Structure formats: C-alpha cells, structure tokens
C-alpha cells in the first residue's frame, strides 16, 4: 500500500511484511525510476532519500508507540540480495524495520533474520502488516514533517 510519494521515491507499507507489526513493523522506500545502487542517484536524490528515510522511521516508531508497541529503535537496510540473480538485477529499495522491545519473533537486541521466501515461505505467512490507524498516522506525520527542497 502506497503511503507517501516524493519527487523521486515511494513509501509503502507491505501487505506481506518481513516483520510482524507487534515485533516492530515494516515499511519500504522504492525509487520511482529503476536504480540498482545508491551511487546511481544524484546528490540531490541521495539527500531526498536520506530525509525520507529518517522521517519515515520516526513516523513508524511514533505510530506503533501510539498502538502500545514499545519500539526501542529503527533499523534501515538496503540489501537487494534476493534479486541479484534475476535478469533485471536488484532494484534499490530501503527497508525500515521497527524493533519492538517485547518482540516475540525478531528479538530485540539480536540481528534480524530473513530466510529467502523460496527456502522458507512459511516464515512470513502469518506476519501481520501495519493496521489502518498506524498507516493513517504515518501518512499524516509525513505530510506534516517531510519538508524537502
């Protein structure tokens, strides 16, 4: 689900997240144009991405805290490992993961664990996405706080 758009990027809340909302939630930033690596972005685009990443992480943390989920920190990752062997290659995207202090699956203070979906599809099967209220809060937070240009 698209939450927010800037000139060069799109922020989404995945319907099939890597992390259950109660473990901290999951957002993803995609580029509007096909880009494989950060180095392919202009300086202006890199600054826009950094600002969007920061504000989106803050919004995720606040939205989940309002839902009673204690977020200790936010992790940011751009890996692209699952698509390196696809003909089109990897596409730059940034994962934003909340880290809940009381997490049941992705334990707080430990490294995140993401098996390849082909190897372990059941791992992701029952993970709950952000709810409507959390998404609404994140949208409003970004509208109010994302000031770039």
Label each residue range with its predicted role.
Residues 1-149:
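HIT superfamily nucleotide-processing domains
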């Amino acid at each position: 689900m698209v939450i927010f758009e800037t000139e060069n990027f799109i922020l989404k809340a995945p319907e099939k997240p890597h992390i259950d909302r109660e473990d901290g939630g999951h957002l993803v930033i995609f580029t509007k144009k096909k880009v494989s690596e950060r180095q392919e972005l202009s300086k202006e685009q890199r600054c826009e991405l950094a600002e969007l990443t920061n504000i989106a992480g803050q919004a995720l943390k606040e939205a989940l805290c309002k839902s009673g989920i204690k977020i200790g920190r936010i992790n940011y990752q751009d890996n692209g490992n699952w698509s390196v062997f696809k003909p089109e290659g990897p596409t730059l995207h940034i994962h934003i993961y909340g880290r809940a202090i009381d997490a049941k699956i992705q334990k707080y203070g430990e490294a995140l664990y993401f098996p390849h979906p082909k190897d372990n599809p059941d791992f992701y099967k029952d993970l709950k996405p952000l709810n409507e209220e959390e998404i609404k809060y994140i949208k409003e937070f970004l509208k109010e706080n994302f000031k770039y240009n």
